[in-house]
């Protein structure tokens, strides 16, 4: 099982979309299935997963951007957003976010 950690950006964003229980349920899912999201093209391995939120299905829910750090057995949650707010974040931009976090 992987450890799930969050960036400071994610910590500020999640309360806009989830309850504490929803956040915990998602973390539990990622800990067991870290490869559940699709790899975003040209992102250097960053993944995106759709997740439902109360009152919506997956298509109306949120998108969570994360990467799996296999060596440390960690899943790092980077960003969360509603699809209605942001259509897509391109791979090269996500790659830059990851590089900044690794420095």
PLM regions: where:
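A short, structured beta-strand/loop element
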Residues: 54, 58-73
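Short beta-strand micro-motifs in enzyme catalytic cores
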Residues: 45-49, 63-64, 76
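Short, solvent-exposed recognition patches
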Residues: 21-29
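Arg/Lys-rich, positively charged N-terminal/basic patches that mediate binding to nucleic acids
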Residues: 1-22
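Short, intrinsically disordered, mixed-charge
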Residues: 19, 32, 99-103
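Enriched for short, Lys/Arg-rich terminal
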Residues: 68-103
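A short, surface-exposed loop/turn module that caps and links secondary-structure elements
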Residues: 28-58
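Residues that recognize and position ribonucleotide moieties
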Residues: 3, 47, 87
């Amino acid at each position: 099982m992987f450890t799930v950690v969050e960036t400071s950006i994610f910590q500020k964003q999640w309360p806009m979309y989830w309850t504490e229980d929803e956040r915990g349920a998602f973390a539990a899912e990622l800990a067991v299935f870290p490869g559940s999201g699709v790899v975003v093209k040209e992102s250097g391995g960053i993944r995106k997963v759709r997740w439902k939120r109360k009152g919506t299905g997956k298509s109306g829910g949120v998108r969570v951007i994360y990467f799996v750090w296999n060596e440390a057995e960690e899943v790092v949650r980077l960003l969360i957003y509603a699809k209605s707010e942001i259509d897509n974040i391109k791979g090269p931009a996500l790659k830059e976010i990851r590089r900044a976090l690794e420095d």
